[in-house]
C-alpha cells in the first residue's frame, strides 16, 4: 500500500523546471511532481497519461507541447493563430518557452510540426503562486508569429460561460498530453489521450484534504489506474459535443497519479472565458 504521508502529497502535473534552490520554499505537502520520493515503487510507471492510449495523428490538433529548460514540461491548447492557453503554474518567468504545434511523436519528425517562441506570458490577474500554486491556474501565451492552421494545427472551440458549464456537466471529457518525468522512467513519445468521467463536487471534496475551489473540478476514476500525470499540466480537458470539441478544463494538479480514491484536478475554463 501507499503510506499516508506519501499519498497525501500534492504534486503538480508539470515536470520539474525549478532550480534546486527553489525546492526549499515547498512544504512536504507540496512536493513537485517529478521529484517524487523513492518510497513508492510504482511512481516509476506513472510517467505519462496513465492508462491512456496513443492518439492518431491530427486527432487532437489543438494540443501543443511546451519546451523550456526541460523538454515537454507541459502542454497547452491553441486558441487562435497567435495565442495558446496553458496552466499558470507551468510558467517560470526566466524560462524561454517554445511552443510546438502539430506534434505527434516527440522522437520523430513528421513535418507537421510548427515551432514558435513565446513573446508574452499573461497569467490570470488573480493568480498568485506564493499564496496558492493551483488557484486560478490558467495563463495565455502569445506566439512570435502566427501558426499556419491546417488539419494538424487547429484551434480548440471555446463556448460562452453558460455553455462551457453545461458541456462540462455532460459528464465525460478527454485529456491528452506527452506527460513524462524529469528524473527517471519512460516518457510518452506519442501523444496519449484518456476519457475521464466528471466527478461531482461532494465526492471530489471528500477525496482530498487540499482545498478544491469553485474554479476547479475533479475528473477521473475512483479505482485508480487512469489519470493525467507529470508533464501533462496545462494541456486540454475537452468535451465533445456532436462531433465538435470544446475546451472545458486545463490539466492542473493531483496527488501522485492514478491512485485509488484520488482524482485529477482541473481548472474550470467556464470561469475564465470572459477574460
Swiss-Prot record:
SMART domains noted in UniProt: Tryp_SPc
Gene Ontology molecular function, alphabetical: calcium ion binding; endopeptidase activity; serine-type endopeptidase activity
Cysteine disulfide links: 74-90, 204-218, 229-257
Domain Peptidase S1: 49-275
PROSITE patterns xref list: TRYPSIN_DOM (PS50240), TRYPSIN_HIS (PS00134), TRYPSIN_SER (PS00135)
PTM annotation (Phosphothreonine): residues: 27
Localization in the cell: Secreted
SUPFAM superfamilies in the record: Trypsin-like serine proteases
Record keywords, A-Z: Blood coagulation, Calcium, Disulfide bond, Glycoprotein, Hemostasis, Hydrolase, Metal-binding, Phosphoprotein, Protease, Secreted, Serine protease, Sulfation
Post-translational modification: Activated by factor XIa, which excises the activation peptide. The propeptide can also be removed by snake venom protease. Activated by coagulation factor VIIa-tissue factor (F7-F3) complex in calcium-dependent manner.
Glycan attachment points: 25, 35, 47, 96, 128
Signal peptide annotation: none
Entry GO CC: extracellular space
Pfam families noted in UniProt: Trypsin (PF00089)
Entry's Gene Ontology BP terms: blood coagulation; proteolysis; zymogen activation
Subunit structure: Heterodimer of a light chain and a heavy chain; disulfide-linked. Interacts (inactive and activated) with F11 (activated) in calcium-dependent manner. Interacts with SERPINC1.
Function: Factor IX is a vitamin K-dependent plasma protein that participates in the intrinsic pathway of blood coagulation by converting factor X to its active form in the presence of Ca(2+) ions, phospholipids, and factor VIIIa.
PANTHER family, sorted: SRCR DOMAIN-CONTAINING PROTEIN (PTHR24264:SF65), TRYPSIN-RELATED (PTHR24264)
Protein name: Coagulation factor IX
Organism: Oryctolagus cuniculus (Rabbit)
Gene name in the database record: F9
